[in-house]
Structure formats: structure tokens, C-alpha cells
Amino acid sequence: MAPPGVGVGVAYLWGKGRGGRKGTPVVVTMESPNYSVVEVDGPDAEAELRTAAVAMDKGGGRGRSRSRTARQLTWVLLLRARRAAGRLASFAAAAARRFRRSPADAADELGRGRGRLMYGFIRGFLALSLLALAVELAAYWNGWRLRRPELHVPEAVEIEGWAHSAYISWMSFRADYIRRPIEFLSKACILLFVIQSMDRLVLCLGCFWIKLRKIKPRIEGDPFREGSGYQHPMVLVQIPMCNEKEVYEQSISAACQLDWPREKFLIQVLDDSSDESIQLLIKAEVSKWSHQGVNIVYRHRVLRTGYKAGNLKSAMSCDYVKDYEFVAIFDADFQPTPDFLKKTIPHFEGNPELGLVQARWSFVNKDENLLTRLQNINLCFHFEVEQQVNGVFLNFFGFNGTAGVWRIQALEESGGWLERTTVEDMDIAVRAHLNGWKFIFLNDVKVLCELPESYEAYRKQQHRWHSGPMHLFRLCLPDILTAKISSWKKANLILLFFLLRKLILPFYSFTLFCVILPLTMFVPEAELPVWVICYVPVCMSFLNILPSPRSFPFIVPYLLFENTMSVTKFNAMVSGLFKLGSSYEWIVTKKSGRSSESDLSTAAERDTKDLTLPRLQKQISESELIELKMQKERQEKAPLGAKKANKVYKKELALSLLLLTAATRSLLSAQGIHFYFLLFQGVSFLFVGLDLIGEQID
């Protein structure tokens, strides 16, 4: 069912003098005094309004515009007034920010300072390690080397000059004063490492039990069989997007082809794009499908606050949302199969406590390069093990932000979408869990999407995914402690969901392998056990790869890359925990617009040629068609002419030099496994620091 008009329909104004031409009305929604939202329902009136605007620009309404009435031109002026008001409001907000320094601005400056502080720490550590290596090389050259210094300390008669005496004093100092703090910190990290490994092992055992007993959510009977009398509920489908011209067409197309009665679902295209040319392309795509009978509306916010959460919150405030029972959310690069709603909606039947049905992600570009292969390992474990086990045994997991269906009542009772963090999906999931709503995960329902193909895009995505949870933990902790849920659920939320899997994992990974291990090379009295460096990490990596057995040849690159990413994750965790500026950053992940199958692109091209142009020629002005074609040509030619360049990441490069320096020092102590681990890990940091993994940025 299309939404009822909340503005004023103007299709009848354009029908006069047009031979009775019919069209779907346009709704210009003025939902706030600053005219912050525009909603277009249907192709005809929007195209006519744009045609009138073009005609005015070309001579005050000569030619076709002579027959238009004053009322028609009034509507054009109203649209222009709306745009002017939006731009004026944006200008006023920008001017206000110039004279008023907000807490977010102060936090952003503090966050940048913290980033420089971490880089300075790594540089200082590197300088000290190079100095220590020079000292050890000089001692080795002079024959002062000791493979195990604690076994023998030279007597006074054995000391050869002041340099040898200084070296012996340095050995005594590090054995008496430096060794103990390093050993204490290493034992603490080893303890955290063992706890996290046990958690990973328990999750894998739970997944094995699910597979063995064939446990999964099931639908009673076949509700869609002929004569079953199934009453299709009203479903709202939301597609939030922002400047994603590479993927908008295929995501809208997939949503419009969902197998559900057309009068029973509505698609909202929530466009937060700042590029007007992209807005025009998305409007044309919406118009194409609307003309084919799909209930689809286009919404654009002039004042884009709150990122994705603000976009979804604005869409849920529409009056017609009260007519819908469920809402399905798909990000701009997701392509649901036509039977998605038939596989998810029936699970709500007879289960009033069920608030969320989450589907699994499947990736169209998982074999594109080494970076996408390594991401696929991580995400396969996340869905196959973490999400599935938590869904079966706890009825709770973190909402993945897309490819899920919410009961609208659950959203409303949990406070709706909040703009306080950049992980609005996890935020609403935690609040719904505290209100007693249950979740289920469907491992056999997969939705196609894309993985970031460049390290820059992946790095920014991981920063948001690891800073947001820590920021959310600060905000949710009082609510968790006072919530009316069982104590074991509170313990699971605090100890496992937040602390162990979001805080401890990046902390010990960075501290143990990037700080303590290099330190022990220059302070050999504090030695890390071999099983911590080699055996247990390899076993844990093997468990991670089990859900994607085809990735087994990449077990060693996966282990090294995860340790490399610990720098980004640790930095993000600190920024979120201490509410620094970078925890508020939201950068849309770069997409490439890859299709799932070869015939998908053929079908899209056929639809564009056979449906878009002929129908748009009837509904859109000639000038707009020319503009659309020019945008299409620029979109196709841009990737060909763009030059790709490598970006240098200073933190990763500095850590690479640090680890390679420590590897050189380990040779003097004849520590074979330590040497090889530090060597390969240092090379891994070097590859990442030089942006040699994944696709280079444009």
C-alpha cells in the first residue's frame, strides 16, 4: 500500500491540457519548519516539475511553458523555495559552528592528538630498539654476547675496559628493574589470551553441537501453499544510502523484485546523498520502478544529521509507518533474493516475543584479492559460529545493521533509532534485549553484498566497528545494571559481549604481539613461551577457518594479518572507550558495484535499455534525459581514467621496522621460532604500511 498523501498532490494540475494523461501524484513533504525532508512518490509529477524548472531557466517559460497556468509555476517556485530554505539552514548551521566550539569538535581535536601520541610512542619505541640493537651488535662483535645472560655474569677480572663494564651494568639493570614489569604484563596478557581462546573454543563446540543435532529455527508447515489462507502482513522495506552510485541500481532492483503482494509492502529509498547528480540518478531509478507498479518512495534529507541512525529515524517518523507491522532493512550494496520475505516473515507468526530475524551475509567478491579472502574468513566465523550459537542458546546477538527484519513494535518500545553512537545497529539490539525481545539467526538465508576491496576502506570500516561498541558500552552500562533481566544475562552482556569480545581481544593482541614480544628480544631475561607465540595462535586460526574450509591455504596470512589489524582495532577501542573524536566518525564504505552473477549484469543492462529509456522518454523531459545520459557516461568512464595510488600508513610502517629490528636481535639469542614469527609479522606490517594488500584507492 502506497503511503497516504501527507503533503499536497499536484498530478491533477499537470493533467489539464495534456490529453488526460494519468500519473502517480508527487508528495512534497514539509515535515519540519526547516523543510528538511523531501519525499517523492511516483515518477510523473516529479518529472513534470523538473521540466517546468528547466523551461523557466531557458527563457521565462517560452514554448511549452506558455500554456502553463500561474498555479503550476507557483508549485515550481515552492520547490525552489524549499531548496533555498534548506541551503540557508545549512549555511546558518555552518556559521554557528564557526562561532561555537562544540564538545564533538573538542573531542575530535583530542582524538587527533591521541593518534599522534600513539604514533609518537611507536617512533620512540623504534628509536630505543635501534639503539639497543646497536649496543647488542657491538657486544656481539667484541665477544661479549651471552646466549643466556642469567647463567653467567662476568667477574671483575673478566671485564675488559669501561665499555664492557657499561654493558654489564646495563645487563644487571634490565635483569633487576625491567624484567619484572615485562613479566607481569606478559603474564596478564597471556591470561587474557587463554580466556579469549577458551571462549572461542566454547563457541566452536556450540556450533558443532548445532550441526550434530541439526538445530535451526523452523517454520511450521508451508504457510504459502495454495489454499493455506495465509494473511500477508504489511512490510516496510528501507534502503538507506549515501553517495553510493556504484550500487544503488542493483539494490533497488533487488528490493523491487521481492516476492510479496505489492499492496502489502512499501519500499523507502532513504537517500542521504550530498551529490545532486547522484540524487538525480536514484530518483530516475525510483521513477522507473514506480511506473511498473511497485510501491516505492524516494526520501532525501536536506539536513543530514545523525548519519544512518538519523536517516532511519526520520523515515520511521512518517505517518504511514503505523500501517506496517514489520520493517526489513538493506544497505545499499545488499541484494536480497526474491523469496527473502517468505523465508523470514513467517518466523514471527505465533511468536509475539520475537523482535528480530537476522539473515546471513554472502559476498560476491570474496575471491577478488587477498584482502577480501581474509575478510571472508572472519565474517564466515562471525555468522556461522558467533551469531548462530548466540541465537540458538541465548536468543540474543548484535544486529548486523542490514539483511534483517524487525518487528516495528520492538523498535518503538526499545526507543527507536538513536543518534548517540556510530553503531546504531548494536545500540538498538542491546536496548531491545534489555526490554525482553528475542532474536533468531537464519544461517541458511543469505543476502548478497560486497566486501571492501581496498585496505583504506576496510581500515575505516574496522575503526567504526571497534570504536562504536566501546562508546556504546559507556552509555549502556547503567541501563544494563538496572535492567529487569536475569543476572546471567547481565553478566553475558558485560563480561562476554562487551568486555571480552570488544575490549580484551584488541588489547591483548596489540600489547602481546606488538609491544611485549619485541621487548623480550631486547630484555631476554623476560622470555615469552613458544606456545603463546606459535602453537595456540595457529590452533585458534584453524578454528576460525573451519567455517570456510576452502580458505585453509590462507591460515598463515590470516594469522599475520589479524595481528597487523590489531593496531587499528586497539586505536579504535581506545578512542571509543575514552570518547575521543574519532569514535564519532562515520565514513561510507567504498563500494565497487559488483553483481552476483554474470547474467545479473546482462539483465540489468537489458532492463536499462528496454524499460528505462522508453518509459522515461514518456515521463521525463528531454533536457533531463540528456542530463541522465551524461551522468551515466561519466559513471562508466570515471573508473577507466582514474589513476590508482598507494597510500602510506606511518604506524604500520613504524611497527614493521620495530618488529624487523627485534627479529634481528633475536638472531643473537638463537631464538628460532621468535625470529621467524617477528620476521614474517614485520613483513606483513610492511606490506600493509605500503598499501600492497587489496586494491589501491582512486
Swiss-Prot record:
One of its GO terms (cellular component) is Golgi apparatus. Its main location: Golgi. One of its GO terms (molecular function) is glycosyltransferase activity. The keyword Magnesium does not apply. Its EC number is 2.4.1.-. GO terms for biological process: cell wall organization. Keywords: Cell wall biogenesis/degradation, Glycosyltransferase, Golgi apparatus, Membrane, Transferase, Transmembrane, Transmembrane helix. It is a multi-pass membrane protein. The chain crosses the membrane at residues 124-144, 190-210, 503-523, 528-548, 653-668, 673-693. Disulfide bonds: none annotated. It is found in: Golgi apparatus membrane. The keyword Transferase applies. Substrate binds at residues 331, 333. The active site is at residues 272, 425. Probable beta-1,4-glucan synthase rather involved in the synthesis of the xyloglucan backbone than cellulose. Seems to work simultaneously with xyloglucan 6-xylosyltransferase. Xyloglucan is a noncellulosic polysaccharides of plant cell wall and consists of a glucan backbone substituted by xylose, galactose and fucose. Belongs to the glycosyltransferase 2 family. Plant cellulose synthase-like C subfamily. This is Probable xyloglucan glycosyltransferase 2. It comes from Oryza sativa subsp. japonica (Rice).
